[in-house]
Amino acid sequence: MTEPKDIVLKESEEVEGTPIEGPWLDEVSSLEEVLDYYERIGFQATHLGKAIEIWKKVEEKRARGEEVRVFLGYTSNIISSGLREIIAWLVKEGKVDVIVTTAGGIEEDFIKALKPFILGDWNVNDALMREKGINRIGNIFVPNDRYIEFEKYMIPFFERVLEIEKERGKPLTASEFIYEMGRFMDEKLGKEKEKSVIYWAYKRNVPIFCPAITDGSIGDMLYFFKEERGDRELIIDIANDIVKLNNLAVTAKETASIILGGSLPKHAIINANLFRGGTDYAIYVTTAIPWDGSLSGAPPSEGVSWGKIRAKADYVEIWADATLVFPLLVWKVMRS
């Protein structure tokens, strides 16, 4: 009979690897030095540390003149938050080559160049908020006057799009529509446009794809515009954008896919990479769960099974709120 002590204190094999270790605060003097420990802390800190190393590798290759085309995908709530300014900076500095987002990621970026969103609270009387005309995104408040102001700009913008389409003899694609929106911002808006993703994408000629561009306030404005003008036709071409997006992946020597959240932007990017045999580098930041079979919760390894991420790709998934980790990730990579 085996003794209880022998069961509890069973001999183990030696394990080779990195010792778990955090920063000794007397020995660090900056956030940068603290982040240097992340890969050794464990749990999601280790995943963030790996993401830092992956993105640094991509940046080092690009600095040497090697082509790694960077695809950035994010859901609308990312732009609702203060991550908008970080993404705008990345575009301004030439760190991103292709963007895919949802309709909210477009319209909220434009609206914030008109009036800011306001920090609120999670615990409020939402029925009362509705009576007051204040919309809520988590603990971020968006008064309806933001959308009223947005409409004042969108109606003349739609008129311009109609003229462009008439001159061209064909509709704009969604990415061209967004590019023209950036041009419109450049002409019509003040200094606040300089913190806009759309504005800098226009200035740096970075395509922004939005396959579901009507799924939000832009769609609402299009509805009003079309209803009020009867048979006047404004068309946004989605089909040709899928060709453009896929070819941006196919023609790249290597690609990196950085995805905040899930849904449509995530799949549009990795599916485009399917046509080249998968992306070479992938960083996912998500709070979605994998066990419901959703695309949003699918880990990078599941993407390998579809051929959307290369089997030998360098990838990591961080289970965390992007507002907590993305600023640290960008700050550390770009300072390095």
Swiss-Prot record:
GO terms for cellular component: cytoplasm. Its cofactor is NAD(+). The active site is at K308. It catalyses: [eIF5A protein]-L-lysine + spermidine = [eIF5A protein]-deoxyhypusine + propane-1,3-diamine. Its EC number is 2.5.1.46. The keyword NAD applies. Keywords: Hypusine biosynthesis, NAD, Transferase. It holds the Pfam family DS. One of its GO terms (molecular function) is deoxyhypusine synthase activity. Pathway: Protein modification; eIF5A hypusination. Catalyzes the NAD-dependent oxidative cleavage of spermidine and the subsequent transfer of the butylamine moiety of spermidine to the epsilon-amino group of a specific lysine residue of the eIF-5A precursor protein to form the intermediate deoxyhypusine residue. Belongs to the deoxyhypusine synthase family. This is Probable deoxyhypusine synthase. It comes from Thermococcus gammatolerans (strain DSM 15229 / JCM 11827 / EJ3).
